[in-house]
Amino acid sequence: MIDIDESLVAELISEQFPHWSTLRIRAVPQQGWDNRTFRLGDDLSVRLPSGEAYAAAVEKEKRALEFLDGKLPVEVPGVMAVGAPSQDYPLPWSVRRWLPGKTIDENSLIDRVSLAVDLGSVLRALRSLPTGAGAAAGRHSFYRGCHPSVYSDQVQIALERLGDDVDAERCREIWLSATTSAWESEPVWFHGDVATGNLLTEEGRLSAVIDLGTCGIGDPACDLVIAWTYFDGEARAAFRESVALDDATWQRAQGWALWKALVTMSDQSSPDPGRTQQRVLARVLSTAP
């Protein structure tokens, strides 16, 4: 990972966008894994990939956001400028509009059933859009939007490493179910990382989706994983009804949730100091697809 701090951001802004150089720069409290984000004044943000693997998303996401702007029931962050690599920071980066609101993991009072309905509506709208401006799922999306079997080897490695710490038989049952169907319709838009930190709320309602760096065109099953990472009970059922996808897609979605939990727990993915993925795995194993 590249060491990115406020002084580096100030240097990049001063060199490439001096008209913004007087604006205050401050890191956001909750940082993602793929990118580092900084406030730039009150109305802008600076977003910098944390490593080379995430750099290709800068230009792709810019094109996607330009296309999606105004076409969804909620806002998306507009890209104001794209910065070039420099001597001190070797990757492209971007300046964006700052969207107000709290992420859903910061808003403990939100009505999850209403949120589930709203999110399902957003994902339905996303799937309905023309796909010409999007990129076909693949390496750039870390294979979100592809068939989950692309990660079968990682699942097997995880089960071997975890041994008796997990119910391997149930895991294999879910994985088999997930990998024996495929998206048979035309490829559609998917977000690729529908996570609690990428959904903004205002006045208790979903107001924006952010971080479309892994978006693309393909199988939308990956966008349903939040059914296990955040929703449960009535909210999960409301999300399932609102998003309006078939049982086979839900089976693949459960496979995506299983994969992420297993690879994280077996140290094949980003760190999980709060053991969130252990709790996700328990939900995945205890629910029917």
PLM regions: where:
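Juxta-kinase regulatory segment immediately upstream of eukaryotic protein kinase catalytic domains
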Residues: 1-19
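Helix-rich C-terminal or lid/interface subdomains of diverse kinases
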Residues: 26, 33, 104, 117, ...
